[in-house]
A protein has these predicted regions:
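Fe(II)/2-oxoglutarate oxygenase catalytic core
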Residues: 1-162, 166-187
């Protein structure tokens, strides 16, 4: 299987601290890339949250520390990261099926591996650190010849998931509560 998963990458306290930093941060509607960056709430209903530099640094170091393990898992050298994005999906939030790979001319880097660090749990009711829905759905993982067969991954706080950036994927709608996650991309 071509999905890397590392439960317990962040402990419960670490997840809570990042969620608290997100609560203090400034949230803006997340953009999509279609030849340029635009907000389209029919495709993505998510917020990018600007957090303090200390929190960004903690996450950057954690991701840098796991990069060699992820490189080994995928069998390729990954030498850099784009930088973490802190995403908040409120009730009704989603991100339709898309690719993370940006291979258009003029892009300095080509995303090769996508990272998602879940900060909330799904399926245990709602409240601090919990939501309903918001599953990560990956296509073409179970059988690459059948790109329509999905693999659904339920958010579990502290779990890091990595997959190739060319895989079609989406975030299913959050039906109750808030889904928080951190994303990044290795090159």
């Amino acid at each position: 299987m071509c999905v890397f998963a590392k439960p317990g990458f962040f402990d419960e306290g670490g997840c809570a601290r990042v969620r608290a930093a997100m609560d203090r941060g400034r949230a803006e509607a997340a953009e999509i890339y279609v030849g340029g960056y635009v907000v389209d709430k029919n495709v993505r209903r998510t917020f990018d949250v600007a957090v303090d530099s200390r929190t960004v640094g903690i996450v950057e170091r954690a991701f840098a520390n796991v990069r060699a393990e992820v490189s080994c898992f995928f069998g390729e050298t990954l030498s850099a990261a784009e930088g973490p994005g802190f995403l908040r999906y409120p009730t009704g939030g989603f991100y339709r099926a898309h690719l993370d790979r940006l291979d258009e001319p003029g892009h300095e880097f080509s995303r090769r591996v996508s990272l998602v660090l879940f900060l909330t749990d799904a399926g245990r009711g709602v409240g601090d650190g919990r939501c309903e829905g918001g599953w990560l759905r990956l296509y073409g993982v179970v059988d690459p010849a059948q790109e329509t067969v999905p693999l659904d991954i339920s958010p579990a706080a502290g779990t890091l998931v990595a997959f190739r950036s060319h895989l079609l994927h989406e975030v299913l709608p959050v039906t109750d509560g808030v889904r928080d996650a951190i994303v990044d991309w290795f090159y």
